[in-house]
Swiss-Prot record:
Residues 1-200 are annotated as: Globular. Gene3D superfamilies: Kinesin motor domain (3.40.850.10). Belongs to the TRAFAC class myosin-kinesin ATPase superfamily. Kinesin family. MCAK/KIF2 subfamily. ATP binds at residues 294-301. Residues 153-184 are annotated as: Negative regulator of microtubule-binding. The modification Phosphoserine is found at residues 41, 52, 57, 61, 112, 121, 133, 138, 465, 567, 579. It is found in: Cytoplasm, Cytoskeleton; Nucleus; Chromosome, Centromere; Chromosome, Centromere, Kinetochore. In complex with KIF18B, constitutes the major microtubule plus-end depolymerizing activity in mitotic cells. Regulates the turnover of microtubules at the kinetochore and functions in chromosome segregation during mitosis. Plays a role in chromosome congression and is required for the lateral to end-on conversion of the chromosome-microtubule attachment. This is Kinesin-like protein KIF2C. It comes from Macaca fascicularis (Crab-eating macaque).
Length: 671
């Protein structure tokens, strides 16, 4: 056994810490060579032990035990540390044998080689694991490596998830990423749709929204549904958006109404919660109005008139027919039978600011106000009906005559407001009136500006009447003393529906679910939401009402841009839209004046005919003939001069309208 105390006593310099030499910082291979030479010079002074003689197997077992112990102590191989390690170890032989008398002592060279082998084994083991022995990692480096590994794992997981999602959705499918995001969002919703068993709440102003399913054209284009209705009064619009870096995301906008009908709701369900509560009102001597409002092609005519199959319509499944059936059911009840009520119906349309009777070969009607400030529709025929079947026949007759045309969004769009009225009369006097209005499809002015003049005039008149309708509903909801019903022919005709304490109104906003109609859908919902938030149930503050009053125009009704916080290009477009609307108003006024002057000229026709007949008599008075001719010419000259001036002004207004339309088309914002 080696006694290191004796070794230290003989060589005290071994216990001294040697300063590091600059060469110790050399690379590992060169450093090992230098240290090996130093150890040889130092270890050569160690004497051999005198107690016992060890064989080669004993030396090998000692070296192996030293190697294992060095690994357990992290093998920090520094020269002073190695010396301390050698000092602490006392390794007994594995197989002790008696000392051999033939050998007196072990040469010092053998001991030196043995120690050298032990140190070299420790050096070798430390060089085999240089990370732990030479450079130990700090905590910061370890944390950075952990974060890097987690990041790589997260990237791999995301890549795997994207691959799985891509397999679920066809990558060639347009907007498939938006479809996936909408599907994931809907998975988090708890849906409780409206059912026939839900209670009906009565409102003076009831605003509902109805979503139609995707039609054949939208399915052929592989459009996605961006509308969700999770509950009976809540609607969500998943508006697709793009960030600056072209990252796609959804902006989910929520709207709350009295009732919200999804694509599975039938006309019967819609009627039960919208128009049916209003039938009782007209039997109580009131006025009721039900509007269907929305983008062209969103399902207004289907809701009001019934199922459509091409141009044919099943009127028995529309709100018109359902309301008439309930009217006759209530009329036959004992409490109302004694009143002796008679049921009359009228059906007319308002097209481009003019009224036409759909039940009288589209005869043109005139709207006048009598001395009692009551609006009268001159020439409108009222038809007596005795059953719901008679009403359906009238509806079929009038619907076949209604004006329609091709627009940006619908090839067979209703371009007029159709008003079907159910009148209750008791002994010739008006007892109650129910007006069911299928409004024309609203479109933005920027979309109709590139069409022909007739389409532009249609769109301008439609938007003007819708804006006036909103103002009248606002006055009704706030119980204002003044109702601005003179702003359009539509509100003039429905004036008595907006005044009086016993007046009730219901609006059904119909929307399209396709992604291409998202902007139009938002415009419709904002219009309907404005009507609802102005009702007494929501109770806006006075500051909000003042802000609503000062707004110049609703984006959802006419599509014009609201001044303020706009770019220079948008301000120019807004100014041009204002000029376009002014030109349209001027054209409409001049047109009416020209028609009046022409009628005056035609009325002078009998005078000329009388003069012609006078000349056929053999003894007519020439003096009388000349006097009458001069008088007729003077009258005709006055009317012709007035007509000529009106026609010139009309031509100028048409040129201004054409110029404004071209400017709008050239600067129209990209969609």
């Amino acid at each position: 056994m080696i006694d290191f105390d004796d070794v230290a006593a003989i060589n005290p310099e071994l216990l001294q810490l040697l300063p590091l030499h600059p060469k110790d910082n050399l690379p590992l291979q060169e450093n090992v060579t230098i240290q090996k030479q130093k150890r040889r010079s130092v270890n050569s002074k160690i004497p051999a032990p005198k107690e016992s003689l060890r064989t080669r197997s004993t030396r090998m077992s000692t070296v192996s035990e030293l190697r294992v112990t060095a690994q357990e102590n992290d093998m920090e191989v520094e020269l002073p540390a190695a010396a301390n390690t050698r000092k602490q170890f006392s390794v007994p032989p594995t197989h002790p044998r008696p000392s051999c008398p033939a050998v007196a002592e072990i040469p010092s060279r053998m001991v030196s080689e043995e120690v050298e082998e032990q140190v070299h084994s420790i050096r070798g083991s430390s060089s085999a694991n240089p990370v732990n022995s030479v450079r130990r990692k700090s905590c910061i480096v370890k944390e950075v490596e952990k974060m890097k590994n987690k990041r790589e794992e997260k990237k791999a997981q995301n890549s795997e998830m994207r691959m799985k999602r891509a397999q679920e959705y066809d990558s060639s499918f347009p907007n498939w990423e938006f479809a996936r995001m909408i599907k994931e969002f809907r998975a988090t919703l708890e849906c409780h749709p409206l059912t026939m068993t839900d209670p009906i709440e009565e409102h003076r102003i009831c605003v509902c929204v109805r979503k139609r399913p995707l039609n054949k054209q939208e399915l052929a284009k592989k459009e996605i549904d961006v509308i969700s209705i999770p509950s009976k009064c809540l609607l969500l619009v998943h508006e697709p958006k793009l960030k600056v870096d072209l990252t796609k995301y959804l902006e989910n906008q929520a709207f709350c109404f009295d009732f919200a009908f999804d694509e599975t709701a039938s006309n019967e369900v819609v009627y039960r919660f919208t128009a049916r509560p209003l039938v009782q009102t007209i039997f109580e001597g009131g006025k009721a109005t039900c509007f269907a409002y929305g983008q062209t092609g969103s399902g207004k005519t289907h809701t009001m008139g019934g199922d459509l199959s091409g141009k044919a319509q099943n009127a028995s499944k529309g709100i018109y027919a359902m309301a008439s059936r309930d009217v006759f059911l209530l009329k036959n009840q004992p409490c109302y039978r004694k009143l002796g009520l008679e049921v009359y119906v009228t059906f007319f349309e308002i097209y481009n600011g003019k009224l036409f009777d759909l039940l009288n070969k589209k005869a043109k009607l005139r709207v006048l106000e009598d001395g009692k400030q009551q609006v009268q529709v001159v020439g409108l025929q009222e038809h007596l009906v005795n059953s719901a079947d008679d009403v359906i026949k009238m509806i079929d007759m009038g619907s076949a005559c209604r004006t329609s045309g091709q627009t940006f969004a619908n090839s067979n769009s209703s371009r007029s407001h159709a008003c079907f009225q159910i009148l209750l009369r008791a002994k010739g006097r008006m007892h109650g009136k129910f007006s069911l209005v299928d409004l024309a499809g609203n479109e933005r002015g920027a979309d109709t500006s590139s069409a022909d003049r007739q389409t532009r005039m249609e769109g301008a008149e439609i938007n003007k009447s819708l804006l006036a309708l909103k103002e009248c509903i606002r006055a009704l909801g706030q119980n204002k003393a003044h109702t601005p019903f003179r702003e359009s022919k539509l509100t003039q005709v429905l004036r008595d529906s907006f005044i009086g304490e016993n007046s009730r109104t219901c609006m059904i906003a119909t929307i399209s679910p396709g992604i291409s109609s998202c902007e139009y859908t938002l415009n419709t919902l904002r219009y309907a939401d404005r009507v609802k938030e102005l009702s007494p149930h929501s109770g806006p503050s006075g500051e909000q009402l003042i802000q609503m009053e000062t707004e110049e125009m609703e984006a959802c009704s006419n599509g014009a841009l609201i001044p303020g916080n706009l770019s220079k290009e948008e301000e120019e477009l807004s100014s041009q839209m204002s000029s376009f609307n002014e030109a349209m108003t001027q054209i409409r006024e001049l047109e009416e004046r020209a028609v009046e002057e022409l009628k005056e000229i035609i009325q002078q026709g009998p005078d000329w005919l009388e003069l012609s007949e006078m000349t056929e008599q053999p003894d007519y008075d020439l003096e009388t003939f000349v006097n009458k001719a001069e008088f007729a010419l003077a009258q005709q000259a006055k009317h012709f001069s007035a007509l000529r001036d009106v026609i010139k002004a009309l031509r100028l207004a048409m040129q201004l309208e054409e110029q404004a339309s071209r400017q709008i088309s050239s600067k129209k914002r990209p969609q």
